[in-house]
Amino acid sequence: LRYFIKTSTRANKRSTVRRLNRRFPRIHSGKKVQRQARIGVYIDQSGSVDDGMLAKFYAELNKLANLAEFTVVPFDTQVAEDKIYVWKRGQSRTFERVLTGGTCFRSPTDHCNREGFDGMIVLTDLMAPKPQACKSQRMWMTTEYYAKHPYFKTSELIVAIPD
């Protein structure tokens, strides 16, 4: 997780005369760099994901909240736009189920491409057809059982949580 967040970090650069350019001091202005990762965490709220698995997902997100701030997006066949919230760094939460239904990875991928996240973490049981390509880095998180028996093959990173 830590490596995924560090590699998904976007840098905002601006010119400044107060910070000197190391290569050409006092000739060219320097750059001020601000790095911040915009991570979208997409939680599968379908009926195939039971409450025990959701509790494990939220336990992992509590650990992830020590590293970075991220946006939590619940989905089943559609993204629940009214249930999206930002999980601040250092915050801790308990799990909540807000949707029940089937699973489709097309709508969260479209949402991630539209919102322009630097990284996409999908917490799911991988029981849906293979999604389309994503513009940002995508990582899958599931339990060990579903990691050994995925519904589709992917070259993207799959992280398994112990059962």
List PLM regions with ranges.
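Generic recognition of flexible, low-complexity loop/linker segments
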Residues: R26-G30, A59-L61, P108-D110
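Short glycine-/polar-rich loops that comprise or flank the Walker A/P-loop
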Residues: A68, K135-Q137
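…and closely analogous acidic/polar surface helices at protein-protein or active-site interfaces
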Residues: A37, Q45-A80, W87, T94, ...
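Von Willebrand factor
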Residues: T71, A80-P129, T142-K148, K153, ...
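Conserved beta-strand elements of the Class I
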Residues: G40-V41, I121
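Acidic, polar low-complexity linker/tail segments
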Residues: R2-G40, G52, N66
